[in-house]
């Protein structure tokens, strides 16, 4: 049995409350954040029947596999360390010449992908507010484009054109968005 350590589970919430990792979508500087937005999510994953199911799988698995560093960090405890493995998310380079130097001698194109119902989990708007302040000081040098709800192929084309992608604040590890951007030579913040 292999247990995937991916995002929401009662152990991750427990570890986040204990300050591991140092910041997350539920805790920042050892203080709860976004708790109202996270209330239903945390409730669902900390119900007794969910905890029993998680416990049965976690304690009876042959291996635990984390795909993000922060999940690996949460599970790196004496009770799980010997069975814990880290397998990062894959990065696919779309075509050989896709990674290139961008933004040379022209306006820097910044792409901000927003999932309105999930931004409290990601924190992209927090980063974007800093980019906006830089753009206000240098309006002729930075162009910010906010997008949401576009088809995947269109989004990949936008990544090809972007110089910078604003991605997740609360993740220690590059997400699939970040990896797709970096494969195209796009800087990720």
Question: How would you label these PLM feature ranges?
Answer:
Residues 156, 178-183:
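Short alpha-helical segment that forms part of, or immediately flanks, the ligand-binding pocket
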Residues 1-4, 15-16, 56, 60, ...:
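Glycosyltransferases and closely related glycan-assembly transferases
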Residues 55-60, 64-66, 71-91:
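Helix-loop-beta element that forms the nucleotide-linked donor phosphate-binding surface
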């Amino acid at each position: 049995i292999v247990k995937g350590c991916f995002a929401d589970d009662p152990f991750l919430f427990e570890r986040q409350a204990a300050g591991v990792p140092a910041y997350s979508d539920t805790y920042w500087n050892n203080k709860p954040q976004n708790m109202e937005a996270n209330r239903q999510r945390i409730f669902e994953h900390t119900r007794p029947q969910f905890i029993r199911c998680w416990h049965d799988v976690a304690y009876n698995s042959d291996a635990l596999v984390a795909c993000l560093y922060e999940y690996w960090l949460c599970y790196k405890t004496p009770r799980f360390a010997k069975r814990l493995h880290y397998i990062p998310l894959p990065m696919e380079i779309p075509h050989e010449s896709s990674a290139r130097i961008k933004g040379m001698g022209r306006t820097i194109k910044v792409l901000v992908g927003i999932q309105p119902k999930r931004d409290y989990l990601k924190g992209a708007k927090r980063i974007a507010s800093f980019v906006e302040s830089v753009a206000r000081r240098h309006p002729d040098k930075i162009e910010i484009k906010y997008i949401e709800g576009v088809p995947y192929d269109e989004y990949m084309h936008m990544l090809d054109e972007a110089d910078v992608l604003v991605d997740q604040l609360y993740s220690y590890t590059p997400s699939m968005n970040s990896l797709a951007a970096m494969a195209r030579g796009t800087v990720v913040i």
